[in-house]
C-alpha cells in the first residue's frame, strides 16, 4: 500500500462510520404528525337564541315576624316561556306561597302572573301572563337523548340580578338521580350537572347546545361544589300536558300500601310470620302491607309481604321513592316491578289505572 492509499484509508473509514451512524439515527427517530388543535364552541349564538324565552319571577309573600306581625317578603326565581299565549313553567317551590307573582321578560317589561296548576311532589308549576306582546316559547328536546358527558347550559335569574339571564355551562354528570329535598320532596328522574345553579336560578332552563330545553333547574346539593339538579324535560312535558288538557295531573293508582324497610321493621315482619328473616338488616326495598280490592296490584298477582326492589329496573330504596317513580307514569301505562317473595325474585307487570 503506497502513502496516498495509507493516508486515505482512515478518512474513508471515518466517513463510512459517520454515514452509518447518521442512517441509524434517522431510522430510529420516529416522525409524528402534529395533532390538530381542538377549540370549544362559542355558546353565544345558543344563549342569544334561548334568552328571550327565559323570564325572571319575583314573588311577594306574607309571613309573621317574631312578634306575630304580618310582614311582606319578596323572593326571586326563574321561569321558561313554553307558549306564545303566555304559559310559563317554573318550580313549585318558587311560587308555592306567593301572594303576588311578577314576571319580568327579557326586555324588562313586567306582567302579573297567575297560577294555572301545581305539581308539588315533582316541584313543577304552570303559570300564565296576559300580554299582546310577541313571546318566544322555548323548544323541547327529549331528555332520553341526553348522555352523560353532553354539554349543557343553565340560564336563570341568579340572585335576582337585573338585566339579561345569568348563564353557566357544564356537562351532564349523571341521569335518573333520586333527590330528597330540604322541604321533604322526593324528586325522581333528575339530571345532575356541574353547571352552576345558583339561588334564583330555580325554574330556569337547562338547554343543550342547540338551545332546546332538556331540564328545568331545580335544586343544588348544599355543602357541595358543582352538583346541581334539573327535572328532566320528559317529566316536565308529561305534567304540563296534563295541566293544560285536564286542569290537573292524571295520577296513576296501583292499589298498594307499603312501607320502607329498615332493620327494626324487618325484625318485626319476621316475628309476625313474614318470610323475611334471611334479609340483611341493611337491605333496601318496600314491603307491601295492604292491597286494595279489585286494584291493579290484585290483578297483577302481588301479595302482602312481597318486597318491591325495583321499578322499570330502577332501584327502589324507600316508599316515597317508589311513589315518586309511579307518579312519572300515566293511567293505562304498564310498569315492571321486581319483587322478592320468600327466597325468590319475581318480575311482575302491573297496569296502572286512574286514582
What are these regions (language model features)?
Residues 34-38, 63, 81-162, 224, ...:
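Conserved active-site neighborhood of the chymotrypsin/trypsin-like protease fold
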Residues 22-68, 100, 147-148, 241:
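N-terminal activation segment of mature serine protease catalytic domains
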Residues 74-76, 98, 198-202, 224, ...:
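Short, small/polar residue-rich loop motifs at catalytic or cofactor-binding pockets
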Residues 51, 78, 97, 142, ...:
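Short, flexible surface segments
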Residues 9-12, 17-31, 45, 114, ...:
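C-terminal recognition in membrane/secretory proteostasis and scaffolding
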Residues 80, 196-216:
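Catalytic nucleophile loop of clan PA
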Residues 63-73, 116-122, 161-164, 176-191, ...:
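Gly/Ser-enriched beta-turn/beta-hairpin loop segments
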Amino acid at each position: 500500500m503506497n502513502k496516498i492509499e495509507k493516508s486515505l484509508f482512515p478518512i474513508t473509514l471515518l466517513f463510512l462510520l459517520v454515514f452509518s451512524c447518521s442512517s441509524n439515527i434517522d431510522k430510529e427517530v420516529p416522525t409524528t404528525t402534529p395533532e390538530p388543535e381542538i377549540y370549544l364552541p362559542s355558546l353565544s349564538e345558543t344563549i342569544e337564541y334561548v334568552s328571550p324565552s327565559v323570564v325572571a319571577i319575583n314573588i311577594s309573600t306574607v309571613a309573621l315576624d317574631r312578634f306575630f306581625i304580618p310582614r311582606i317578603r319578596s323572593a326571586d326565581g326563574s321561569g321558561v316561556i313554553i307558549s306564545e299565549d303566555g304559559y310559563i313553567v317554573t318550580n313549585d317551590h318558587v311560587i308555592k306561597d306567593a301572594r303576588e307573582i311578577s314576571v319580568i321578560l327579557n326586555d324588562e317589561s313586567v306582567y302579573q302572573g297567575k297560577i294555572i296548576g301545581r305539581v308539588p311532589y315533582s316541584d313543577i308549576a304552570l303559570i300564565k301572563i296576559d300580554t299582546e306582546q310577541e313571546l318566544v316559547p322555548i323548544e323541547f328536546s327529549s331528555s332520553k337523548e341526553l348522555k352523560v358527558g353532553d354539554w349543557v347550559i343553565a340560564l336563570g335569574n341568579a340572585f335576582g340580578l337585573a338585566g339579561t339571564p345569568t348563564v353557566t355551562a357544564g356537562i351532564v354528570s349523571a341521569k335518573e338521580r333520586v333527590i330528597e329535598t330540604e322541604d321533604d320532596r322526593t324528586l325522581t328522574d333528575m339530571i345532575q350537572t356541574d353547571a352552576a345553579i345558583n339561588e334564583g336560578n330555580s325554574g330556569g332552563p337547562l338547554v343543550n347546545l342547540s338551545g332546546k330545553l332538556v331540564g328545568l333547574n331545580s335544586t343544588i346539593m348544599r355543602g357541595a361544589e358543582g352538583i346541581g339538579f334539573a327535572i328532566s324535560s320528559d317529566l316536565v312535558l308529561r305534567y304540563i300536558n296534563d295541566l293544560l288538557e285536564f286542569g290537573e295531573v292524571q295520577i296513576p293508582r296501583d292499589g298498594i300500601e307499603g312501607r320502607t324497610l329498615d332493620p327494626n321493621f324487618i325484625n318485626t315482619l319476621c316475628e309476625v310470620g313474614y318470610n323475611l328473616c334471611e334479609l340483611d338488616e341493611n337491605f333496601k326495598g318496600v314491603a307491601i302491607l295492604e292491597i286494595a280490592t279489585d286494584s291493579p296490584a290484585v290483578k297483577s298477582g302481588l301479595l302482602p309481604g312481597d318486597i318491591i326492589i325495583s321499578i322499570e329496573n330502577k332501584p327502589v330504596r324507600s316508599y316515597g321513592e317508589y311513589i315518586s317513580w309511579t307518579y312519572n307514569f300515566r293511567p293505562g301505562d304498564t310498569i315492571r316491578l321486581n319483587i322478592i317473595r320468600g327466597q325468590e325474585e319475581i318480575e311482575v307487570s302491573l297496569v296502572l289505572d286512574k286514582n
